[in-house]
A protein has these predicted regions:
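Substrate-binding/catalytic subdomain of NAD(P)-dependent oxidoreductase enzymes
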Residues: 118-119, 129-227
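Rossmann-fold NAD(P)-binding glycine/threonine-rich loop
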Residues: 35-47, 57-88, 92-94
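Rossmann-fold NAD(P) dinucleotide-binding segment
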Residues: 13-55, 59
Length: 266
C-alpha cells in the first residue's frame, strides 16, 4: 500500500510507488484526491496489465475516454463506480443506459447538500461547514466541494459515460455556495442541482442553486444523501438515491468494484 502519511510502520506501508511496482500487484486501489500523481500511477499500472479500482474522480475525469481505452487495450479492468454518487449507482446507470438517456438531474455532492440544509435551518455558512467537517463529510480544505469542482468532475464522468461527451471543467457553468446565506426563507428546499442533457441543439450541462418544490424527488434528499433522476428518450424516468458523502458509501462502492474484478479475473 502506497500512502502519503509516514506515521505508519514501514513493514506495513510504503510511501514509494517503486515499492508498489516491485510487489507486482494484481489490483491497485486509488482513494487519493489530486489528479497528480494518481493519473500517472494508474496509467503505469494499467500499462502493466494491473487492474485498477479508483475513487479519484478528478484523475478519472482528466483521463477521460483515452484512459478507458488504454485499460481495454492492455486487457486491464478500470473500475470507478465510487467516483460519482458515493453509494448511489449513477455511473453504473450511465453505462447501462447510454444511448437512451436524454437528461440527468442529480445531487452529486453530499457535503454541500448537508451544508445547504443546515444553512436553511438557520446556521451560518461557517457553522455549517465546521459541522460538515466534524462529521467527516467535508475535507479540511473544502474548496472543491463548495466551488463546484468536485461536482464538476462527476458531471464530466456522467457526460462521458451517459452521453459520450468529453467536456472540461470550464465548460460547466457552476454556482458556488461559498459564504452562501439565504436572503429570504426558501419556499421549498435549496439544492445545488447538476443537470446534463442532450437535445437538437446539442449537449449542455450546468450546476446551479435552485429552490425546489418539496414534492420534487431531488428536493427530498436530506443531509448527506444524494438523489438522481434519469430521463429516457421513450419518456420513462428512473430515480435512484444513496448516501453521497462520508467514508462508508465510498468504501462500499470501492469494495463492490473490487469484488467484481475478483469474481471475473481470479
Amino acid at each position: 500500500m502506497c500512502i502519503r502519511d509516514r506515521g505508519y510502520s514501514p513493514s506495513e506501508l510504503t510511501t514509494s510507488f517503486d515499492d508498489v511496482l516491485a510487489s507486482k500487484p494484481d489490483i491497485f486501489i486509488d482513494v487519493s484526491g489530486p489528479i497528480d500523481p494518481a493519473l500517472d500511477y494508474c496509467k503505469t499500472l494499467l500499462g502493466m496489465g494491473v487492474h485498477v479500482v479508483s475513487a479519484n474522480k478528478q484523475a478519472i475525469a482528466a483521463g477521460g475516454q483515452s484512459l478507458i481505452d488504454f485499460a481495454r487495450d492492455n486487457k486491464a479492468h478500470l473500475m470507478f463506480s465510487s467516483a460519482a454518487g458515493g453509494g448511489m449507482p449513477v455511473l453504473e446507470m450511465c453505462m447501462r443506459e447510454r444511448g437512451r438517456i436524454t437528461r440527468v438531474e442529480a445531487l452529486l455532492n453530499g457535503t454541500t447538500n448537508y451544508m445547504l440544509g443546515e444553512i436553511s435551518a438557520g446556521k451560518s455558512y461557517a457553522d455549517a461547514l465546521k459541522d460538515a467537517q466534524d462529521k467527516g463529510f467535508a475535507e479540511a480544505d473544502p474548496s472543491s466541494d463548495v466551488n463546484g469542482g468536485d461536482a464538476g468532475a462527476k458531471i464530466r464522468l456522467i457526460a462521458l459515460l451517459g452521453f459520450g461527451e468529453e467536456i472540461v471543467l470550464d465548460d460547466i457553468p457552476r454556482d458556488t455556495i461559498e459564504n452562501f446565506a439565504l436572503t429570504e426563507p426558501a419556499k421549498g428546499a435549496m439544492k445545488r442541482v447538476a443537470t446534463c442533457w442532450k437535445d437538437r441543439n446539442g449537449f449542455s450541462t450546468k450546476l446551479e442553486l435552485k429552490d425546489l418544490s418539496l414534492n420534487n424527488f431531488i428536493a427530498q434528499a436530506d443531509g448527506e444523501e444524494a438523489h438522481a433522476i434519469f430521463y429516457f428518450e421513450d419518456g420513462d424516468q428512473y430515480k435512484i438515491r444513496g448516501k453521497g458523502a462520508g467514508r462508508w458509501p465510498t468504501t462500499e462502492s470501492v469494495m463492490a468494484d473490487l469484488f467484481d474484478i475478483s469474481a471475473t479475473y481470479f
